[in-house]
């Protein structure tokens, strides 16, 4: 058995270790104590001082450490144990998804009733208020099968603590599907054969957007916005400056990230300085997807961000796009207190010092390949 790569996870106490072999029994187990009937390599890792538990599924381990232990000291011992060697991994692989939490909402005939969050190491679910459950059940016909007709709708990637994200996403869903509209959704579901209503896009102007002070109505406008262009900078720039509601600023950043022109950079830079770390990280992700090297100075500044999910994105961007000009900034931050960030900075320094080409993000590499 060999280690393919080590990946950080949104939990500071969990590391994901990808192996070159899959479990033959297709099962999953959590191990907390050494037992004779367990695989030897599991017991060997559990014997490492500081390891709390191991979750083993498919081709990876999620190793949990005790809070007082430092990954910088503990991880080499774990990897050495798995490798049957005294050395850890020579060339760790960059993780394109550090800190990401996938948000989804479960719908039946367009009526939402459950939210699910999934990180690399944890899943969390929450039912919406009872009126949504009742509406979902009321929309069911005699010959309907909820299990087969329900559908998970992807709400995109979020960042932060799962409890905070759950509160934010739930608030968004309640805003997008107000209780006053539920009766109409139920009536429509019962009177038509349409199982999932087609999403309708509607372009709005800055004047229309500003005509309402209701943030929920504004969010519905942004969620229904078609692919934006430079002509939409006034509206989206205003939304990015929204002081009250994080979902509005985040959605505006997501839309701005669709505009593949350098003129969008000042707006995304503003997002990099937002008061919400989730918005800052989203802006960083957009800059990474666009891959404009003009963003390098701003990403160097982001290495000082108070939240590690933002610092990690900055280090990853420099790994993807940076050159010798960024070495001073990287070396200044190479002792970052977050091990995941420190690892990414070390990888960026190594690539640049070795003279390896900056290939850009995986998304950018795919886009360039498709253009050729």
Curated annotation (Swiss-Prot):
> Which GO molecular function terms does the record list?
oxidoreductase activity
What's a Pfam family in this record? HEAT_2
Q: Which PANTHER family match?
A: CONSERVED VIRULENCE FACTOR C (PTHR12697:SF37), PBS LYASE HEAT-LIKE PROTEIN (PTHR12697)
The entry sums up its family as follows:
Belongs to the CvfC family.
Q: What is this protein called?
A: Conserved virulence factor C
Native source organism of the sequence: Staphylococcus saprophyticus subsp. saprophyticus (strain ATCC 15305 / DSM 20229 / NCIMB 8711 / NCTC 7292 / S-41)
Upper lineage ranks? Answer: Bacteria, Bacillati, Bacillota, Bacilli, Bacillales
């Amino acid at each position: 058995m060999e280690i393919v790569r080590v990946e950080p996870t949104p939990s500071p106490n969990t590391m994901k270790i990808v192996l070159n072999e899959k479990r033959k029994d297709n099962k999953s187990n959590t191990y907390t104590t050494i037992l004779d009937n367990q695989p030897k390599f599991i017991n060997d890792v559990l014997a490492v001082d500081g390891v709390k538990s191991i979750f083993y599924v498919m081709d990876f381990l999620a190793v949990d450490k005790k809070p007082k232990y430092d990954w910088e000291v503990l991880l080499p011992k774990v990897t050495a144990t798995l490798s049957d060697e005294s050395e850890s991994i020579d060339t760790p692989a960059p993780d394109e998804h550090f800190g990401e939490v996938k948000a989804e909402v479960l719908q039946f005939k367009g009526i939402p009733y459950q939210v699910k969050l999934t990180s690399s190491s944890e899943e969390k679910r929450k039912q919406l208020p009872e009126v949504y459950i009742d509406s979902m059940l009321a929309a069911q016909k005699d010959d309907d099968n909820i299990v087969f007709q329900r559908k998970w709708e992807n709400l995109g990637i979020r960042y932060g603590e799962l409890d905070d994200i759950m509160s934010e996403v739930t608030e968004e869903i309640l805003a997008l599907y107000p209780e006053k509209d539920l009766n109409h959704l139920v009536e429509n579901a019962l009177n038509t054969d349409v199982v999932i209503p087609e999403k309708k896009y509607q372009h709005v102007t800055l004047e229309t957007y500003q005509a309402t002070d209701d943030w929920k109505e504004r969010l519905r406008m942004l969620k229904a916005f078609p692919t934006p262009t430079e002509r939409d900078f006034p509206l989206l720039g205003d939304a990015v400056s929204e002081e009250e509601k994080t979902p509005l600023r985040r959605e505006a950043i997501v839309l701005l990230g669709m505009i593949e022109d350098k003129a969008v950079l000042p707006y995304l830079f503003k997002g990099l300085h937002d008061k919400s770390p989730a918005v800052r990280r989203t802006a960083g992700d957009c800059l990474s997807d666009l891959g404009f090297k003009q963003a390098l100075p701003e990403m160097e500044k982001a290495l000082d961000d108070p939240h590690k999910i933002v610092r990690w994105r900055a280090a990853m961007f420099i790994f993807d796009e940076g050159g010798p000009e960024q070495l001073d900034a990287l070396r200044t931050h190479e002792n970052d207190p977050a091990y995941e960030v420190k690892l990414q900075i070390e990888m960026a320094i190594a690539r640049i010092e070795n003279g390896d080409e900056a290939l850009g993000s995986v998304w950018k590499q795919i886009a360039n390949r498709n253009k050729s």
